[in-house]
């Protein structure tokens, strides 16, 4: 190519390069914006799904005395005699369930509670199944094959009273900061996938 031809083609090449560079410059920030919006939309979608999961479990209104307040702390023995407190679970979502072996709806609820407990084993979510039976013998006879439910025994029956519980079963979902967020009167099917999704929203 002659010197004159090269000189003539130079503006064309430069213009072509500018044509490619301009969309690229405009596209990079655009991709960043789209990435942020995608993240926000995904995060919002997950939050909505978990909120819907909680509603699917049909929670009852949180008692006024507990609404937006820290759950009453308690310390009770497990089957080995070790004392376990609610406050020691801080930083984890917790499902507190008040029940008894002599309570028919509680007994009906236990299989789904067991199913949930097994699925929670490898998560940071805790379950505290507080029995108001009169002795460990009754609880041990009930769970002949053992249990994953994290059973504690309250011989005084004062802990349920501190939560305002008068009938069994009743359950409270407590968030990682120790506040009661959801309340359930009577039995629920805790084997539903919504149960874990709802608890996950309390991290």
Q: What spans do the regions from the language model cover?
A:
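A short beta-strand-turn-helix
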Residues: 65-68, 73-94
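Short, internal strand/loop/helix patches
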Residues: 128-130, 140-177, 185
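A structural alpha-helix within SAM-dependent methyltransferase catalytic domains
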Residues: 114-118, 200
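Thiol-/selenol-based redox modules, centered on thioredoxin-like
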Residues: 49-52, 173-203
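Conserved redox-active cysteine motifs that mediate thiol-disulfide chemistry
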Residues: 90, 98-115
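N-terminal targeting signals for export/organelle localization
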Residues: 1-70
């Amino acid at each position: 190519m002659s010197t004159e031809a090269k000189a003539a083609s130079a503006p064309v090449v430069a213009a072509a390069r500018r044509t490619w560079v301009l969309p690229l410059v405009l596209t990079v920030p655009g991709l960043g914006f789209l990435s942020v919006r995608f993240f926000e939309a995904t995060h919002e979608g997950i939050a909505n799904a978990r909120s819907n999961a909680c509603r699917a479990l049909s929670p009852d209104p949180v008692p006024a005395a507990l609404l937006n307040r820290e759950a009453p702390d308690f310390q009770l023995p497990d089957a080995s005699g070790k004392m376990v407190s609610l406050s020691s679970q801080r930083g984890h979502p917790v499902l507190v369930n008040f029940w008894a072996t002599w309570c028919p709806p509680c007994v009906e609820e236990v299989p789904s509670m067991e199913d949930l407990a097994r699925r929670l084993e490898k998560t940071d979510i805790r379950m505290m199944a507080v029995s108001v039976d009169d002795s460990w013998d009754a609880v041990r006879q009930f769970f002949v094959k053992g249990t994953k439910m994290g059973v504690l025994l309250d011989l005084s029956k004062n802990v349920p009273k501190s939560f305002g519980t008068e009938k069994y079963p009743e359950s409270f979902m407590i968030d990682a900061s120790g506040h009661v967020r959801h309340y359930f009167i009577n039995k629920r099917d805790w084997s539903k996938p919504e149960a874990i999704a709802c608890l996950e929203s309390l991290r």
